[in-house]
Amino acid sequence: MELRQLKYFVGVAEDLHFGKASKKLFVSQPALSQQIKLLENELGTELFVRSKRIQMRQVVLTEAGEMFLAEAKNILQLSEKAIRIVRQISTRQKVVTLGVFKLILPERIMGMLEFFSAHFPTVEVKLVELPNPVQVQEFVANAQIDLGMTVLPLISKGLHAVQYAEADYTILMKRDHPLAGQDAVRLEELRSDKWIDHGRETGLYFEQLNEACRQANFSRESNIFHYVPSFDLLKSMIRLGKGVAFIPATLDLTQEPLLISKPITNSDGTPFKQVVIEHVLIHKSSQPIVELMARTVKQGRHGTNPQYPGK
């Protein structure tokens, strides 16, 4: 019996719905069903009543399931308590520096700080704001910060990335752009626009985005007006009406009254599927407490903690 199986069981038992539980637990429904079945086989009894008359993957607890739910919760609580005690002993009087790309939404940053505070109450997290995502990687690589929050795919060697969230791409444009009044923009509607980008080496998913545009029957790369080294310059170029740009939906634009970001759809109206991954970065030779914090972020993504910053 694994703690993971107990978490899965509690998740389904609380929602009484495999579909809802699978989303909260970040696991596919088939995998969730398989783990529950393995747990039932080990216990030698069914924990849920499954009926074809029950629609939408809903279930109800058996009598054994109701009794096991209370015990499973106790086991998980004891496990979490043991982990907290060990962490408190091993992380006393520690100071960790967290560097963040300054355009990440404040809610994401505060969520990460609260998450660390809840799991590492004796660790002081000092926040450092950095102007662009590349610099976050450079600072981690050069040991100027311990952890980094950024949206850029790895370009620096010696780093380890832990995904904590993902975000849809949107189109950043000036508010007087002809398409700014639409609820969403079809990618093919941008075939005549000029583009601002960071370039092949440091751009966010540069090749994937170019391929998406080719699928929409136009070449974005040949329409790129200018490559810029930072998001500040990218925004400045767009404020001047020099083009449009792909940006993650989680970037903070509250201080940009002249700019607006729009959701993207495919030509058939379906949502644009390309997403950008948000990472916590650490150096591969980080001190143990930093590795533990990154590992906790990874575990949090696959758990049910409502405070998790990527939820």
Task: Locate each region found by the language model.
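N-terminal short secondary-structure element
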Residues: 1-35, 68
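A short LG(V/I)-centered, amphipathic sequence patch enriched
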Residues: 40-61
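Alpha-helical linker/hinge and terminal dimerization helices associated
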Residues: 42-46, 68-90
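Central regulatory/effector-binding core of bacterial HTH transcription factors
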Residues: 93-156
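Hydrophobic hinge/microswitch elements
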Residues: 131-136, 141-145, 151, 201-263
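Beta-alpha-beta core module
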Residues: 157-163, 167, 232-285
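Flexible hinge/capping segments at coil-to-helix
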Residues: 161-169, 173-195
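Secondary-structure junction motif
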Residues: 193-217, 289-294, 298-300, 304, ...
